[in-house]
Amino acid sequence: MQDSRRPCIVAGLRTPFARSGTVFKDVTAVQLARRVTQELLERTALDGREVSEVAFGQVIQSVLTPNVAREVSLLPQLPPTVPAFSVNRACASAGRAISYAADQIARGHADVVLAGGV
């Protein structure tokens, strides 16, 4: 790849581990993704206007909110026009979203991509 930029992960955050059916049993995947993303934006002091795109993986998509990335992109810290899409590749969903983000940066299509998964 000529003139490739070298992407880097600037910050990462995740929810604590918990047994299934316990502390997170009443929290939706979208709520988890939004909480973690909000906290990440606050900790890094990243200006949401710098985000070029949002990519999220979701192992089991909800019928009510099939595009978790779009739900995350509606956070008040991000511009409402930021493109967002979700990936579904079973357990590799988040990894694929992060890989896509790195590719977009390496190819010069984006400067900052918010990527993750639930």
Where are the language model's segments positioned?
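Short, conserved beta-strand segments within well-ordered enzyme catalytic domains
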Residues: 53-55, 86, 113
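Short pre-catalytic strand/loop immediately N-terminal to key active-site residues, enriched for Gly-Thr
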Residues: 81-89
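Active-site-proximal alpha-helical scaffold in enzymes
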Residues: 88-118
